[in-house]
Amino acid sequence: GGGLLEETYVQLWRIYFAMDRLNLAAAMSLRLQREFPESIYLDEAILQQARVAQKSGDHARAIALYTNLTRLTKSQLRGEGQYGIGECYEGMAKAARGNAEQMYERAFQAYKMVFDQHPESGRVGDAVAKMASFYYQKKDYGRAVDVFEKVLSDHPDANFLDVILFNYGRCLFRLDRRAEAR
């Protein structure tokens, strides 16, 4: 039971989040989790809490919440959670003074896991673009090309090929393989 109350909690947390009242959004999300542990909105609630934590700069908490989301085996949002982990590490790397390289590496690994473990996710294209961007920034065009070629062979009809082909062409151009880049 509790359908109406459950849906009210969901609507309230969405409203609070849209109003940028992050503490209230997180509180409603937690209340939903406590009172309706079997809710079909549970994964969405965890995702929302993680986004609240991420938006407020609490990357460690956001990573913990996103990790919890990736462990919900029936959730369709697991890839979204994995992508969020990558975003958090990337945010931490951008804010870091000295040890940014390690955080960028963790972000890269998180994005790679979206591609490897959640190929059904709507975030695969974004994740691959982020992976390639890391290689591109390091001027490691050969490895970026390898990533793109693997994606093109594994997902020849994916909906994110435009991003892949654009970046693939950029890297081929940088490798002086201009004929292939066309």
Task: For each feature predicted by the language model, list its residue ranges.
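Acidic, polar-rich low-complexity tracts and alpha-helical solenoid repeat scaffolds
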Residues: G1-R182
